Design a protein with these regions (language model features):
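PP2C/PPM-type serine/threonine phosphatase catalytic domain
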Residues: 1-226
């Protein structure tokens, strides 16, 4: 199945944008990949971490288009990204840097969703949220402390949580950093995502609310399965 999509990524009230998003489409192989990474502001070079992980996942995906099932590719892409981050952090001297990640790959009529941290994916169908990733965050320390992520000093914490679903034409998939969903009530976000207006207009409304209420970078990918 193919997708129709739109993306956005803004620094918001922060000085720099440490979020990254990418979309890859391979129409001849009937698959696509969407990735959002949110560099961790509590560590140095969060933007570099997000860029490194996102690029490594996309490069692995492009190099393995014809091989392996989607779940295996997702897991191995995350391993490649973790290795890339480890190597990047040691170019001069060991540097602490990390990023969250959420990705969704669609092959034929199956979507494989993986995430580490508090970046989210929503799968919506017929006015309902069919699936939403659960944040990897420590409830004792609040939502600001993630328990699973890509971290240069500890590659083991980058084990992704993976889920698979059948998708249908008309399904909507939304990937975003926490700067989006923390800017509005959950019911408002999901209502906006299901608006029948053109995707660009739907995203414009979400961006407007983020501009007003988000205190972080905000990034998202909204796609419709066709």
């Amino acid at each position: 199945m193919r997708i129709r999509y739109t993306t956005f990524s803004e620094a918001g009230k922060r000085r720099a944008n440490q979020d990254v998003c990418r979309v890859i489409e391979n129409p001849e192989n009937n698959n696509s990949l969407m990735v959002v990474c949110d560099g961790m502001g509590g560590h140095s070079m969060g933007d570099v971490a997000a860029e490194t992980v996102c690029n490594a996942i996309c490069e692995y995906w492009n190099s393995n288009t014809h091989t392996k099932d989607s779940e295996t590719k997702v897991i191995e892409a995350c391993k490649a990204a973790s290795d890339a981050l480890y190597k990047r952090s040691r170019v001069v001297r060991p540097i602490e840097m990390g990023t969250t990640m959420v990705m969704a790959s669609i092959e034929d009529n199956i979507v494989t969703i993986a995430h580490c941290g508090d970046s989210r994916c929503y799968l919506l169908r017929d006015g309902e949220v069919v699936y939403q990733t659960q944040d990897h965050a420590d409830p004792h320390w609040g939502s600001e402390v993630v328990t699973r992520c890509f971290f240069s000093m500890n590659p083991e914490v980058a084990e992704p949580e993976v889920a698979r679903f059948e998708v249908q034409p008309g399904d909507r998939i939304f990937l975003c950093s926490d700067g989006v969903y923390k800017a509005m009530a959950p019911q408002i976000l999901t209502a906006r995502l299901q608006d029948e207006k053109p995707l660009e207009e739907v995203v414009d409304v979400i961006k407007f609310m983020c501009e007003k209420y988000s205190t972080d970078n905000y990034t998202g990918i909204l796609a419709i399965v066709e």
